[in-house]
Amino acid sequence: MERDFDLGMGRPGGLGGLGGEPIMQQMPQPAPHHPSRSSNDHNVKNLMKQAEENSGYLTLQGNRRKADLKELQFVEDIGHGSCGTVTKCRYKSVIMAVKTMPRTSNSYEMSRILMDLDVICLSFDCPYIVRCFGYFITNFDVRVCMECMATCLDRLLIRIKQPIPERIIGKLSVSIIKALHYLKTKHQIMHRDVKPSNILLDWSGVIKLCDFGIAGRLIESRAHSKQAGCPLYMGPERLDPNNFDSYDIRSDVWSFGVTLVELATGQYPYAGTEFDMMSKILNDEPPRLDPAKFSPDFCQLVESCLQRDPTMRPNYDMLLQHPFVVHHEKIETDVEEWFADVMGECG
């Protein structure tokens, strides 16, 4: 399973999730300006020192213990990307996924790694975000030990060669909206890279959000950097070169809507070169679901998320109250059984 390691600029300030045991209080607000390269280098070095103090500890079954990197036993490769690799490893009796990212002198890349670490450690109490057991920082790399999931949704679509049923997407929607809502309400964090490759599924049917390297700290509920994220899932307001305004979580709502269309149809809704696709996002009417194939509530949910004007899109509280989401939160859907069936069909 190939994984997409999109890593982005971290926020200024302390490492709320890396400063020892998990903490519940909100982190300090960052200064509302872009630091110079030299100040950012200094900031990254300080944050790395904080992180190093808690390197080598794993929290397993509620117990935090000092661990030796040598005790991690390699099992198999899971995937790789331009910025790192993921392997399946065993620590004593626990199977885990270990994401290894090289340490570099590039403060931009290191701030991304630190951001990913920070968010995943902060989110220890959220059942909809992939769980982190701990991490190891060496002179050469950073290794993050996480729960081992079965696959990500983009690789699943490629493997099963068919769309994901609406009833399964309903359960996926509940989990992802709750994960995004948690990040916003509890930590004032915006994911900024919502897409199928960052949604994980395990064999028990549990759905979780991952990859927080380019998440952004919100200042008065708004984000200011427009570079972060995969452009093919960005809202028009983030792609428009003439738009210099900040944006809010409703940009992630657009990304969520595009993801829903891709899962429901089995393919990304725009065609052509990357330039062509970005041009269509900016200029064409947003994609819609075929009402002959999907329920009215599902079609309306997608339509509400994919509004060109971001102020017309719902926020997370509104999404959680949407009839499609409310319905699928209440009903029982055997995601585990469906997943086992489709994986069995494709060998």
Swiss-Prot record:
Reactions performed catalytically: L-seryl-[protein] + ATP = O-phospho-L-seryl-[protein] + ADP + H(+); L-threonyl-[protein] + ATP = O-phospho-L-threonyl-[protein] + ADP + H(+); L-tyrosyl-[protein] + ATP = O-phospho-L-tyrosyl-[protein] + ADP + H(+)
Transmembrane segments: none
Null allele phenotype: Loss of kgb-1 activation. Hypersensitivity to high concentrations of copper (> 50 microM) and cadmium (>5 microM) and to food starvation which is characterized by a failure for most animals to reach adulthood. The few surviving adults appear starved and are defective in egg laying and are infertile. In addition, have moderate susceptibility to pathogenic bacteria infection characterized by a shorter lifespan and a substantial decrease in pmk-1 phosphorylation. In absence of stress, animals have no obvious phenotype.
Documented EC number(s): 2.7.12.2
Domain Protein kinase: 72-325
UniProt KW keywords: ATP-binding, Kinase, Magnesium, Metal-binding, Nucleotide-binding, Phosphoprotein, Serine/threonine-protein kinase, Stress response, Transferase, Tyrosine-protein kinase
Tissue: Expressed in pharyngeal muscles, uterine endothelial cells, intestine and in neurons of ring ganglia, ventral ganglion and ganglia around anus. Expressed also in hypodermis and body muscles.
Enzyme category, top tier: transferase
Active site: 193
Post-translational modification: May be phosphorylated at Ser-221 and/or Ser-225 by mlk-1.
Cofactor: Mg(2+)
Biased composition (Gly residues): 10-20
Binding site for ATP: 78-86, 99
Activity regulation, short description: May be activated by phosphorylation at Ser-221 and Ser-225.
Keyword Methyltransferase in annotation: no
Single Gene Ontology BP annotation: male meiotic nuclear division
Residue positions where Phosphoserine is found in the record: 221, 225
Effect listed in the UniProt record for changing residue 99 to R: Loss of kinase activity. Loss of kgb-1 activation. No effect on the interaction with shc-1. No effect on phosphorylation by mlk-1
Record GO cellular component, one term: cytoplasm
Outcome of substituting residue 225 to E: Phosphomimetic mutant which probably causes constitutive kinase activation. Loss of pharyngeal muscle contraction and egg laying. Formation of vacuoles in the pharynx and uterus lumen
Role this protein plays: Dual specificity protein kinase which may phosphorylate kgb-1 and thereby is an essential component of the JNK pathway composed of mlk-1, mek-1 and kgb-1. May also have a synergistic role with sek-1 in phosphorylating pmk-1. Involved in the response to environmental stress including heavy metal ions (Cu(2+) and Cd(2+)), oxidative stress and starvation. In association with sek-1, regulates germline cell apoptosis in response to oxidative, osmotic and heat shock stresses. Involved in resistance to pathogenic bacteria infection. Involved in axon regeneration after injury.
UniProt name for this protein: Dual specificity mitogen-activated protein kinase kinase mek-1
Encoding gene per record: mek-1
